[in-house]
């Protein structure tokens, strides 16, 4: 037991010593790296200052061109990915439409079989349609005929002149209208009626009473 405890203590002491040494190394390396970077920047500045302006401009232009090329490549890649995505969507839509159309075609033949019409019926259909059109025309003509008759009668009434209330035929002719020869025939029955005795006078003279007076 004592040996185990001693070994554990020794191991912990060694580990602490190693950790302390490593931390010191890192702290020493970090300032060295920062100092190296500062030295590099200074060297670049000196080199840039020694380079003429034309070379600087060319260098800057090349850098800008490289940046533009990189941007164009990125844009092309983005467009390519978008086109691929759209093509995938289009293909998926077409596949769904094809599946729907195939399913509908499977359903439609059963209905078309039920609705099959022979050729004879198809040839007879235009004749039936013509007959129906003729029947409709006749019916329309029959409906219009009474209206035409009424309109014609009204037109005749409007066109006919008003009759005069004092026509010569409405009254008996005056005696001076006829000639003397005609007046003989016209006046003779009147005088005959005045001369002939009535039924009462003949009955008184003959003393014969008619039967209808007896009652």
Swiss-Prot record:
Keywords: Milk protein, Phosphoprotein, Secreted, Signal. The modification Phosphoserine is found at residues 33, 99, 101-104, 111. GO terms for cellular component: extracellular space. Mammary gland specific. Secreted in milk. It is found in: Secreted. One of its GO terms (biological process) is response to estradiol. It comes from the Eukaryota. InterPro entries: Alpha-s1_casein, Casein, Casein_CS. The keyword Phosphoprotein applies. Its main location: secreted. Residues 1-15 form the signal peptide. The keyword Phosphoprotein applies. Pfam families: Casein. Belongs to the alpha-casein family. Important role in the capacity of milk to transport calcium phosphate. This is Alpha-S1-casein. The lineage of its organism: Eukaryota, Metazoa, Chordata, Craniata, Vertebrata.
